[in-house]
């Protein structure tokens, strides 16, 4: 999938339907209207919550990952930046690792600590 705003919003709808808000794999909030916006936030009970999002490659391209839909996730921009192009990474106090799904060519992100 070519990653651009149009395709990203279609991918959001495939993943979350008509929902305006969702959480990424780390639990960070995303707002559909915040695609690609580093400064997008909402006020929730008087607290500003950053919820811009973009597309994350589960298996980074540097490790052989592609833009196939099975290798993509919607993630909060902060989550994506923390994960970077690594297959083992920390976000806060959580350690994650990209693992191959047994019997397939697909990968997933697993919290290991």
Give, region by region, the residue ranges found by the protein language model.
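Generic detector of leucine side chains in alpha-helical contexts
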Residues: 9, 29, 57-59, 72-73, ...
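Polybasic, low-complexity binding patches
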Residues: 63-70, 81-113
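Histidine-centered nuclease catalytic patch
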Residues: 34-75, 83-88
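Short cysteine-rich loop/turn motifs with clustered Cys
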Residues: 2-52, 76
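Solvent-exposed, non-transmembrane amphipathic alpha-helical segments
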Residues: 27-31, 75-78, 92-99
């Amino acid at each position: 999938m070519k990653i651009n705003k149009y395709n990203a919003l279609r991918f959001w709808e495939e993943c979350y339907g008509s929902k305006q808000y969702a959480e990424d794999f780390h639990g960070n909030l995303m707002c559909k209207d915040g695609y690609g916006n580093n400064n997008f936030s909402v006020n929730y009970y008087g607290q500003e919550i950053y919820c811009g999002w973009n597309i994350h490659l589960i298996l980074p391209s540097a490790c052989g990952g592609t833009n196939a839909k099975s290798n993509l996730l919607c993630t909060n921009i902060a989550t994506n930046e923390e994960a970077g192009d690594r297959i083992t990474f920390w976000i806060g106090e959580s350690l994650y690792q990209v693992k191959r799904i047994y019997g397939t060519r697909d990968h997933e992100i697993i919290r290991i600590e």
